[in-house]
Amino acid sequence: MLITNPALLGILASLVPLALGAPNQPIQARSRKCVIPSSYASSHGTADDSPAVASAFAQCAENSVIVFQEGVDYNIFHPIKATNLSNVEIRVLGNLHLPQDITAVQNIVKSGQSTWFTFQGPRVDWTGADDIKNGWINSYGQAWWDANPANSSSFPNRPHLMSYKTSQASIKNFRSRKPIAWNVKLQGDDITVSHAIVDATSTGGFPFNTDGFDVEGTNISITDSVMFNGDDAIAVNTPSHNIVFARNTIGYQSHGMSIGSLGKDPTDFANITNLRFEDVTVIDALYAARFKSWSGGRGLVKNVVWKNIRTFNVTFPIFVTQSYSDQSASRSGTIDPFSSVMMEDFTWSDFSGTINTYHPGDGSCVTDPCWYNVGLPNLKHTEAIVLECNTESSCKNFRTEGIRLHPQSKDSPSVICMKATAELNPKLGFECKNGTFVPH
């Protein structure tokens, strides 16, 4: 079953009163303020406010506060790029609207402007409205999803919503409604994200590639947020260290809390350590906890914990593959099938909930077999755990404990396990073989 919009709104409303935490103290006062004017109302929603927005970011690029006015609508018909920011607060108290003309947006992307908002610089804070009716970026992605050709996962020339590269910064009350595709590429150091909302629920076509946060950096936390989408809620990419994803609710047709994909380019050495995913509710998703790397990849991912994860109607609650495939991507060059992105010190602890037995999978399947079933023998959709290690030495010190996952059919939970050897994984918690899940 899928969560309806009223249910989603209930979850969103429940998060508003939660404490946001103390903001970072700026090194220097933000003594200048740029309040952005809007022509939306006077033009009956037809005028482009992008020039006024660009002007504000140019005038207030340092030690400033840039304000989208409370309850005011803004048309952002052209991409905004501000890469020279320093000690700036972006205060989004109104609502932003991307163009609804698909062809116009595609032409902009084809011209080389692939990201709609690009922000870069130290201490760049995003502060959305406390009022849940405001602070939204409206991308009108539903029309894009519905226009996607049958049996295709890649509608051409879709923009990324936002690239955000900063340090010593916070993002609070970020809200994205119907993103066309990817939401936020987040890069940097010492960044806290809290009370974010991504609503990519669809009434028609599947919302392909609507990732919540694609993360690359150090000391980054994402907490107290809701993401209902059609791809990873969070995807941790290389290099990344000390990442926390906690107290969040994710779902719709989500691809869960993911690491990767890694190793597609075997010359790109993966380097990821110290990740913690904790106290997360996962609803109606394809995956909950996922690791994905390509065979032939290189590198190391170490010290990863998923803990206290609650699943409701999830197809693959725990999923590891070191032989990932992407139905919309191809590889070039020589691939060594015995090379892997090494995994070491992984823990899955205190998982509880239900496995989607009756209607497994999601709308991202456009191939036969479905991309997410490739290489899995005799799927029953009672699998609590799927571990696909590429070689007998590529998975080390895996640990499971407190796994209480149950198929909706009330059959016994099962496991698919390949090459996670007992010698390298003495605390795995079950025998690595395909069949009924029997915890030790």
From Swiss-Prot:
Specific in hydrolyzing the terminal glycosidic bond of polygalacturonic acid and oligogalacturonates. The keyword Cell wall biogenesis/degradation applies. The active site is at residues 231, 255. It catalyses: [(1->4)-alpha-D-galacturonosyl](n) + H2O = alpha-D-galacturonate + [(1->4)-alpha-D-galacturonosyl](n-1). It is found in: Secreted. Keywords: Cell wall biogenesis/degradation, Disulfide bond, Glycoprotein, Glycosidase, Hydrolase, Repeat, Secreted, Signal. The keyword Glycoprotein applies. Gene3D superfamilies: Single-stranded right-handed beta-helix, Pectin lyase-like. It comes from Aspergillus fumigatus (strain ATCC MYA-4609 / CBS 101355 / FGSC A1100 / Af293) (Neosartorya fumigata). The gene is pgxC. GO terms for biological process: cell wall organization; pectin catabolic process. Disulfide bonds join 389-395. PbH1 repeats lie at residues 188-210, 217-238, 240-261, 272-293. PANTHER family: EXOPOLYGALACTURONASE C-RELATED, PTHR31736. One of its GO terms (cellular component) is extracellular region. This is Probable exopolygalacturonase C. Pfam families: Glyco_hydro_28. The lineage of its organism: Eukaryota, Fungi, Dikarya, Ascomycota, Pezizomycotina. Glycans are attached at residues 84, 151, 219, 271, 313, 434. Its EC number is 3.2.1.67. It is an enzyme of class 3 (hydrolase). GO terms for molecular function: galacturan 1,4-alpha-galacturonidase activity; polygalacturonase activity. Belongs to the glycosyl hydrolase 28 family. Residues 1-21 form the signal peptide.
